[in-house]
Amino acid sequence: MDVFPEELPGLPPDREVEFVIDVLPGTAPISVTPYRMAPAELRELKSQLQELLDKGFIRPSMSPWGAPVLFVKKKDGSLRLCIDYRQLNKVTIKNKYPLPRIDDLFDQLKDATVFSKIDLRSGYYQLKVKECDVPKTAFRTRYGHYEFLVMPFGLTNAPAAFMDLMNRIFQSYLDRFVVVFIDDILIYSKTESEHAQHLRIVLQILREK
């Protein structure tokens, strides 16, 4: 199935939703000194930076903004590169896009007996950052100063922006057999045959989008 490539090959297409970072009026660019890293972390940092550069997700930056980076160990022992955007988040105007209420989600599922969940791996990288806001995503490392062209993890409005995109994509099927919660899609049906049909529709949409 070509719906789920092992890795995203490069920049996503232009979409009706772009990720914007509106900051409080009068905010000056914030730059934070890079954190210390162990030798093993530095090797991993160099490798992950190169991968992000090769895919076009980041580019070298001259921005006056700059967040530090750190690693978080995942369950499988591998290291996830995280940008510490806490200072930027403090001055970002919050997006009020509503996340769904959990009790509303359960109401939709009450007659369903068959479920599938799709976790959109690296889903945030499907959304481009608005060009004028790219410099605000900048981060500093021992190996240089970079900025994101796609929406990175850790920004305060990222979940709402991705939710907005997913709801637009699946608008026709919400409250029928699809629940979207940030980067998870739940498909629910009353019967297995109905579920197979619902899955085909969702996978086709994902392939096209």
Show the residue positions of the predicted features.
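Retroelement reverse transcriptase polymerase core
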Residues: 1-209
